[in-house]
Amino acid sequence: MTETTTGPVSRADLLALTPDTLTALANRGLVKRATKELDAGTAPSLTTEPDTTVRARFDDGITAVLPPGVGLDNGSCSCAAPGVCRHLVALVLAYQRDAGAGTDGAPVPVPVTDWSPGSTDDRALADALGARTLAVARRTFERGYGALVHRPTAERPEPWVELPTCTVRFPVPGEIAYALTDAAAAVRDEMVALAVWAFRVADEAGTEDRSTTVQVGGRPTARPTARPELDAAAALADELLREGVAHAGPVLRGALARAGDALAAGSLHWPAGAVAELTGQLAAYADRAAHYRPELVAALLTEVHARRRAAAVPGALGTREAGDTPLRRVRLTALGCRVRGTAEALVAEVYFAHPGAGSVLVLRGEWTADGQELNGHRLATRRVLSTSLSALATGSLVSESVRRTASRALTITRGRLGTTSITPVGAAWTQLPEPLLVRDLSALTARWRGRPPRLIRPRVEAESVRVVALSEVGSIGYDPAEQCLEAHVRDAAGTSAVLTSAYRPECPGALDALADALGSGATHISGSVHRSGGGIVIDPIAVLTPAGVTVPDLAAGDGSTALAAAGSRSPDPLTAALDEAISALAAAAHSGLSRPTAPTRSRIDKAATALSRTGLARAAALLRAFLNALDGQAESGRTAAWLEAQLHLLVSSELRAAES
């Protein structure tokens, strides 16, 4: 029974705490135990004081107290348990039941409220979080940071913010103290303050969009050329372009590695990532590794210059991103695994959905052959986090020792594996929130319109990886010319897409396993979603069927299963012309602009002719300008002409893929 001086519904914050929110604030075991005790009739006696402080007195004499304006972790209890205890949870549940008494005994429903945490002023923030915490957060504010602000919707009725290295949710309207974040406890309050300030900036912008990207704080941006680390990296990229990957020695590779370290030390995270990947490609070529790709090297060289040119554009350099952040106890849902490499060395990337953050994270592992050639299936039994790679790629991971980088990569703190557990994934895919679970691919890709080119977007791992709910799996066939499996599918909204998976010798059984899973009642598929030629294409990672999750890259088999032939597709002349031109410029970068070969010149000339025939006159002119530079200009003129042509081609190719 509740005794109150202000009425039984005076604490709207307690009524707004759903079982899921209580679980996040405490843990599932405490919520279950408190619920069970209340169901058994051992409810505490509640008293609401004039200032709306709620006291709960239990039969064993224990008293729990929850003042207004504070979260559960700031409540008090006379029991010996540290932190949030079952008595505080029982106080909330009992209060909700009393508030619902007189109808059917259910808690009073709380309507969805369109509110903004940005309405909380700094005085209230200091009261809730502490002046010292606010001072620490203010230093991050002065450096500046980016955030993605989400306002309440019918599907997700709580405001939330995606910060560079964590997510903050506000489940209780008007109450900052109940904010939830996946950041570790040591930085929790600081992240809450940053999220509130992000909402404040979004509110001042006055946009009606339910999701909007904002840049918060920061001093005026310096001139783009006032960054010596970036200038040094661009100069080394030019040197590599002149010399060519085929002639790059260990001295240049070492200089690039040091340049990448300097960029990272200067918090230029996105160009640092590009230089690190470029250094990895040079090492792959030196080792004659199969994952060396000339087109990727050319794109990375271009990216370094593109980010330098766009240095004044918010988000182009990643200077406002934190290096990494420890996360509190998190539950992640595995979405499968991608294996790349050779028989001598393989890299496995396990993808995890983070439901609380609405993002996909990547955990990467590397293995080298130990007397036996490696492939995806043999990798499946290798140990990762005290379990097999196969179990990890099809499981749910609960951990208190995870760190998340700005690029959404995961690391597990060494020596704390005991705080990490893995259980089968079950039906967790079907319970993922949007935007992780996609039911309408058209709506997903529509949100991509107007975003910056990939060359200057944030370097986020698994940017386009999603789980797609399927309503239909149509024809499945193998294209021997392209060495890829194709399947026509429809999502839950009826939008069609083409599922395409290329054969890779390191995973010989992947296509057979994929075809079998698609033909066995597939209901969901995880994969990288992108647009190509106006259509939607999915590169699959794993498939959910009534029998469970199939990860093709880890499947057994030698690829000898006979697959039905895929239907023929009409080639797209625009895409083909752009692809060939990009490949021709990549070949020039591979051999070096200081020593262009006759075959390279001929290939570029033919590519320019093809571009002209398809109406891409500007692209053709830039290619011919590069050819002219090879004949008469100094090496600096050659690199400038190559860069102008390459930039135009890469952006044109991206725009062509997005056309509807």
Residue ranges and their predicted role:
Residues 1-660:
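Long, low-complexity, compositionally biased intrinsically disordered regions
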